[in-house]
């Protein structure tokens, strides 16, 4: 058997063994995709014992390409919500998550200096302790750029594997410990979170208002500033028993009922100007109007603003709201449409059908993957990651590398959505498949390279001390920030658990947090809020630590 055939066969065996290990769960908790790393270590141990020779060049290419696939698909997935997560609504959560990253870096630096841990080993421990695989890839690349011998670079994968299990268990222990310390009632926390969401300013809500202001009588909607702006959509108007879709030229009369969509603060301002909220239903049932959700798939409307499509004027149809990557938005006229946007349309059936034809509404297109944008994005990401940034006094130029470059480029392209007929939307199933393939390839190679010396290091070497160092890097930041968030910021417990899981980019921890109260979305929401920024910082941190440690000796 040729070296290439043998290498591919061994990698397939590693994937099978590793995925099996990852699927084994104890009380609902398992290693997940991290099992592939240990599958690689097991197979790598026996490969080393048998004296087999694998193609090192091929392993290196597979490892790097797997990492690129993984981080690129993550960026495409979270890109649409990344910049929104940095705004005020998620600022507090992101600050606490960043604090966890900073404290983890400080603990790593202290351990490195106190115990004189070799640089590749301490970076591997750091990456494993925070259960972040792209950090491992970024650290290995910067070490190679600094001229570290390959046998030392491979030690990083071994120390990563030592620290990884407690990285997963440590965050679960922290959640449990904080629950005990603060005597948390999970049901109460879930109710408080739901109440805050209802009263908060981030959700899109609807209300029905009666026109009671005599100054508005006989005015057109376009002449009422609060109704003609971008913060509120008036999607229905009821006069006596007639329900209609209002256009900008529709005349308002006293006693009219308006169905408004917007954020709570803006709707409150509308009440002050127009009139009081009423309980009267403005449902389309029993009328010639209907409400329908339509998905944007027509390439000809991508990038166009809603106001430029003139749906109100041409079809008497109102877009009441827009869902983009799971986030509900007010469908203001200045929003540019992206592939996969889901629009709520209100109008007559024939008019809605006409608008749906303009927008595309081809569900099958959502399952198709445009491969050209994928490779354009990967290519641009690799180029971005290869740009050196020279910092005075540093022995090597800083680079985003093959982990950071594709991630940043994917975040940008995911936010842009489309350029001409090229769109970077990727069906969730396709995104997940590419992401899992990438991480399996990467971890398989890392495990194989570490497996030869793993058992000897654990039994006869410094493996146990590495595990202890990793436990400190995991536990100290999580416990410190968890206590601060609860005591000083009075953060909701479920929200805090999601933030802690997101700060470690740890899906098993998110699964545990979600199971604390299965019907509450608090943990998932905070996890998604901090995940993009933390993923970026986790990739950059080992590079900064490597250069700093290297420069100060």
From Swiss-Prot:
PANTHER family: K(+)_H(+) ANTIPORTER SUBUNIT KHTT, TRANSPORT PROTEIN YIDE-RELATED. Belongs to the AAE transporter (TC 2.A.81) family. YidE subfamily. Pfam families: Asp-Al_Ex, TrkA_C. Its main location: membrane. NCBIfam families: PRK03818.1, YidE_YbjL_dupl. PROSITE patterns: RCK_C. This is Putative transport protein YidE. InterPro entries: AAE_transporter, RCK_C, RCK_C_sf, Transpt_YidE_put, YidE_YbjL. GO terms for biological process: potassium ion transport. The lineage of its organism: Bacteria, Pseudomonadati, Pseudomonadota, Gammaproteobacteria, Enterobacterales. It is found in: Cell membrane. The gene is yidE. Residues 191-276, 279-361 form the RCK C-terminal domain. GO terms for molecular function: monoatomic cation transmembrane transporter activity. The chain crosses the membrane at residues 4-24, 28-48, 65-85, 95-115, 158-178, 371-391, 393-413, 439-459, 464-484, 493-513, 533-553. It is a multi-pass membrane protein. It comes from the Bacteria. The keyword Iron does not apply. HAMAP family: YidE. Keywords: Cell membrane, Membrane, Repeat, Transmembrane, Transmembrane helix, Transport.
């Amino acid at each position: 058997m040729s070296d290439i055939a043998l290498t591919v066969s061994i990698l397939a065996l590693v994937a099978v063994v590793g995925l099996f290990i990852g699927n084994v769960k104890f009380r609902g908790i398992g290693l997940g995709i991290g099992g592939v790393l240990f599958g690689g270590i097991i197979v790598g141990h026996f490969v080393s014992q048998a004296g087999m020779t694998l193609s090192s060049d091929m392993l290196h290419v597979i490892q790097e390409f797997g990492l690129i696939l993984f981080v690129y698909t993550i960026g495409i997935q979270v890109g649409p919500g990344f910049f929104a997560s940095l705004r005020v609504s998620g600022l507090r959560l992101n600050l606490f998550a960043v604090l966890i990253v900073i404290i983890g870096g400080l603990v790593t630096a202290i351990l490195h200096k106190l115990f004189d841990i070799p640089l590749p080993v301490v970076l591997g421990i750091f990456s494993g302790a925070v259960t972040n695989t792209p950090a491992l890839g970024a650290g290995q690349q910067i070490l190679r750029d600094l001229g570290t011998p390959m046998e030392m670079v491979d030690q990083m994968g071994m120390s990563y594997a030592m620290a990884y299990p407690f990285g997963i268990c440590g965050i679960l222990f922290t959640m449990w410990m904080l629950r005990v310390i603060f005597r948390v009632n999970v049901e109460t926390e879930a109710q408080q979170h739901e109440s805050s969401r209802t009263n908060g300013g981030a959700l899109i809500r609807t209300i029905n208002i009666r026109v009671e202001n005599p100054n508005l009588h006989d005015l057109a909607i376009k002449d009422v500033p609060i109704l003609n702006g971008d913060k509120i959509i008036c999607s229905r108007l009821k006069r006596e028993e007639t329900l209609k879709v209002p256009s900008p030229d529709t005349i308002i009369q006293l006693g009219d009922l308006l169905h408004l969509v917007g954020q709570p603060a803006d709707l409150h301002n509308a009440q002050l100007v127009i009139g009081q909220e009423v309980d009267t239903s403005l449902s389309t049932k029993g009328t010639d109007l209907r409400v329908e959700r339509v998905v944007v798939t027509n390439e000809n409307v991508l990038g166009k603003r809603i106001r430029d499509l003139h749906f109100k004027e041409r079809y008497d149809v109102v877009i009441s709201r827009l869902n983009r990557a799971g986030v509900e938005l007010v469908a203001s006229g200045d929003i540019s449409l992206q592939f996969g946007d889901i629009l709520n349309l209100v109008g007559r059936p024939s008019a809605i059908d006409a608008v749906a034809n303009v927008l595309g509404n081809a569900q099958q297109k959502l399952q198709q993957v445009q491969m050209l944008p994928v490779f354009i994005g990967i290519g641009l990401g690799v180029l971005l990651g290869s740009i050196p940034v020279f910092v005075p006094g540093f022995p090597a130029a800083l680079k985003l590398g093959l982990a950071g470059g594709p991630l940043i480029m994917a975040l940008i392209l995911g936010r842009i959505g489309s350029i001409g007929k090229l769109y970077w939307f990727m069906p969730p199933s396709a995104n997940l498949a590419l992401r899992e393939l990438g991480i399996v390839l990467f971890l398989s190679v890392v495990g194989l390279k570490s497996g030869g010396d793993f058992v000897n290091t654990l039994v006869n070497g410094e493996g146990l001390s590495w595990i202890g160092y990793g436990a400190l890097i995991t536990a100290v930041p999580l416990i410190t920030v968890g206590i601060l968030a609860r005591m000083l910021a009075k953060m909701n417990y479920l929200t805090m658990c999601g933030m802690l899981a997101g700060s470690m980019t740890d899906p098993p921890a998110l699964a545990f947090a979600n199971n604390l109260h299965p019907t509450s979305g608090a943990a998932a929401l905070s996890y998604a809020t901090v995940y993009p920024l933390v993923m970026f910082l986790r990739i950059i941190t080992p590079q900064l630590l490597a250069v700093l440690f290297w420069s100060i000796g």
